[in-house]
């Protein structure tokens, strides 16, 4: 007996030692990643917002990919000198694989030469100055350049809005001057006349009469059919108010710095003043994919705040380092080379889209989207100009120009993308059929669009197995067309039954165009006009409403459709994406009926099994027969429960309850065999005492195990 105890202790100690080694190994396997943000001073709030995004991303990557990233956090106060000092501090750490951070371009420019000299790959989050990427081969920016933004603003202004006579206002700092110079150069080539130029100092407050002094003649001011403002958000806000006060009602176009909640705050600026104000943007939550939806939801849940638009880029920067490591690039040079090798065909799919860098300046190759400040939000404009990447687009240039799919400006081609707003309100869930992996629902569906080239009848529900729609109302005479339907049908869905019956199920309806891909049509969810009240009619009545969610995204079919142009180049298949819009309602299963219908019968079977302990240990045959009957009862009951559910390749929460029951009954059978051998050895009294002890322990232990299981699964299901 002593030898067995010593052996048991030795085995247990060995297991603990192995676990400790594994744990220590994981710690040593963690990759250290520098994160430099303004965590104090004027930009502290934004810096902490971005830091939370980086932490969330690192946690998700560790959970999903098993890659441990230890964030080494530093504060640069968004100041160039402090950024340089912090960069030197990080550069002295040989364990660091890379750096993410710096908010303004000025701070990034202060740190970039240090990173390049130390050969540390650095991803700057919001640096739009092209000189950041040109600082050296180890420095990249997650943003597009000021030059690209200004040129795309000019392209939209002349081709989409048909404006030719412009008032330009810019700040005198590098941000304003690079935007100004690039816009002026592009405007000159596009035939846009800059009727007047104004400049203001970035340092210090903007004079309250800046516009009134510079443009005193209200009558003369009516010559401008557009105003372009190249300034930071605080000055931009004041300039917009002063322009409106001076009677200038022309459209105003601002850079991405205007993506500030201040422009949506009626305490700071009226809705009348922001009418016809358009803003450039590298990313929009309204157009975000499912990753963006989950990130935004997790960010709100964990911080109680709305993520800053640059928080998405910060999260993507962490993802890019993880992607490099996942592909075997585990040192600085390999990671840098991986970043430099990325292109459209091999891009990393992130929250903000496909991630890859320009070769000439190592700035992120992003589209510049245009939004309108309307209804208290940055609303996607009905027309977007995007740059093509696929070879087949250039090959079919002449044909596509003739059809209006492309426009050519300044010897460059742009894709003309029509935006369609899609809204959907559920009013009845008729059935949730887990076995068929489908649900039946009724809802109102509507579309809003401007282009005559769009036929909304060709926008279909992608996951519908059977669906019908009846026209309710329409208005095709206005500039913004509108059509609404009442829909009813059955929709395919891949239910997640891992936590059944503690589960929540999302019931999505996904829409996409039948034939036009994302280079022609972009779907955006019309969340402004959707209802988010609970769905009252849900059948069968074992579900309760949780929430309603929506996202936009891209769906790629793994097919060339037989088009030879999609196979240009050896071994390459064009990435043909279709824009999709998804609206889903989340339901939670009511657990109370399952306590009586599922778990109570199982507990009754186990309770009856406990009474076997009341049978004298000498009556082995009777005890064994009853034990086998209990085992068969649990097995049949388990199979009966499973027959009502679909076949899946993983264990459900319900299965664990039956596993505990099997262990309980099998333990009892094993004890009966043990008791028989003891009785044959004429140790009846000692065996009966052990039997009585087990009778007192078994059922309370089972109840305790089931309680712990229930609490665990209920907690997991909530998160």
Protein language model features and the residues they cover:
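Soluble non-transmembrane domains of integral membrane proteins
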Residues: 344-346, 352-365, 372-379, 384-582
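Extracytoplasmic "Venus flytrap"
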Residues: 34-55, 74-80, 172-176, 306-312
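Segments of small-molecule ligand-sensing domains
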Residues: 298-311, 322-378
């Amino acid at each position: 007996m002593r030898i067995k105890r010593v052996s048991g202790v030795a085995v247990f100690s060995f297991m603990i030692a192995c676990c400790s080694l594994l744990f220590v190994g994981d710690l040593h396997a963690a990759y250290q990643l520098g994160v430099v943000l303004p965590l104090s001073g004027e930009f502290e709030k934004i810096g902490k917002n971005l830091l939370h995004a980086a932490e969330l991303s690192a946690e998700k990557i560790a959970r999903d990919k098993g890659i441990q990233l230890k964030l080494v956090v530093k504060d640069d106060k968004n100041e160039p000198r402090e950024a340089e000092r912090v960069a030197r501090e990080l550069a002295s750490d040989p364990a660091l694989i890379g750096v993410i951070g710096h908010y303004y371009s000025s701070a990034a420019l202060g740190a970039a030469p240090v990173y390049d000299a130390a050969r540390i790959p650095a991803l700057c989050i919001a640096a739009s100055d092209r000189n950041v990427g040109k600082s050296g081969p180890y420095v990249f920016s997650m943003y597009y350049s000021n030059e690209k933004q200004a040129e795309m603003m000019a392209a939209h202004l002349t081709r989409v809005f048909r404006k030719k006579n412009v008032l330009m206002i810019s700040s005198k700092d590098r941000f304003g001057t690079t935007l100004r110079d690039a816009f002026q150069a592009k405007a000159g080539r596009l035939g846009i006349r800059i009727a007047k130029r104004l400049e203001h100092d970035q340092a210090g407050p903007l004079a309250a009469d800046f516009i009134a002094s510079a443009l005193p003649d209200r009558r003369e001011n009516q010559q401008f059919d557009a105003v372009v403002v190249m300034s930071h958000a605080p000055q931009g806000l004041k300039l917009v108010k002063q322009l409106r006060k001076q009677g200038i009602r022309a459209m105003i176009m601002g850079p991405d710095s205007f993506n500030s909640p201040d422009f949506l705050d009626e305490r700071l600026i009226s809705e009348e003043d922001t009418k016809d104000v358009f803003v450039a943007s590298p990313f929009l939550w309204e157009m975000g994919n499912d990753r963006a939806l989950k990130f935004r939801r997790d960010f709100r849940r964990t911080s109680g705040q709305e993520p800053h638009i640059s928080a998405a880029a910060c999260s993507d920067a962490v993802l890019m380092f993880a992607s490099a490591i996942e592909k075997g690039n585990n040192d600085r040079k390999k990671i840098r080379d991986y970043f430099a090798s990325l292109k459209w065909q091999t891009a990393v799919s992130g929250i903000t889209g496909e991630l890859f860098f320009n070769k000439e300046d190592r700035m992120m190759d992003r589209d510049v989207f245009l939004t309108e400040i309307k209804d208290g939000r940055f609303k996607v404009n009905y027309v977007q100009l995007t740059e093509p990447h696929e070879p087949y687009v250039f090959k079919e240039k002449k044909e596509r120009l003739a059809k209006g799919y492309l426009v050519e400006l300044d010897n460059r081609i742009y894709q003309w993308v029509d935006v369609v707003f899609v809204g959907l309100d559920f009013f009845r869930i008729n059935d949730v059929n887990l076995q068929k992996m489908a649900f039946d629902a009724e809802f109102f569906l509507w579309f809003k669009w401007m282009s005559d080239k769009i036929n909304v009848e060709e926008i279909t529900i992608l996951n519908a197995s059977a669906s019908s729609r009846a026209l309710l109302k329409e208005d095709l005479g206005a500039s913004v067309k509108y059509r609404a339907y009442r829909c009813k049908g059955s929709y395919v869905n891949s239910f997640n039954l891992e936590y059944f019956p503690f589960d929540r199920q999302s019931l999505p309806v996904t829409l996409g165009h039948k034939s036009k891909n994302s280079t022609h049509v972009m779907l955006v969810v019309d969340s402004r006009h959707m209802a988010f009240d609970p769905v009252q009619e849900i059948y069968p009545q074992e579900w309760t409403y949780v929430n309603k969610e929506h996202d936009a995204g891209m769906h790629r079919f793994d097919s060339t459709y037989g088009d030879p142009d999609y196979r240009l180049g050896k071994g390459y298949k064009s990435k043909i994406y279709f824009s999709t819009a998804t609206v889903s309602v989340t339901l939670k299963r009511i657990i109370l009926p399952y306590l009586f219908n599922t778990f109570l019968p199982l507990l009754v079977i186990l309770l009856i099994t406990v009474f076997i302990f009341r049978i004298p240990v000498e009556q082995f045959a009777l005890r064994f027969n009853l034990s086998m009957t209990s085992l068969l009862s649990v097995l049949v009951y388990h199979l009966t429960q499973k027959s009502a559910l679909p076949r899946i390749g993983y264990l459900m929460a319900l299965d664990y309850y039956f596993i505990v029951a099997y262990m309980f009954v099998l333990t009892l059978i094993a004890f009966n065999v043990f008791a028989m051998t003891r009785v044959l050895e004429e140790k009846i009294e000692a065996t009966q005492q052990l039997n009585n002890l087990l009778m007192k322990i078994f059922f309370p232990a089972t109840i305790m195990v089931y309680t712990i299981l229930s609490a665990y699964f209920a907690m997991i299901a909530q998160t």
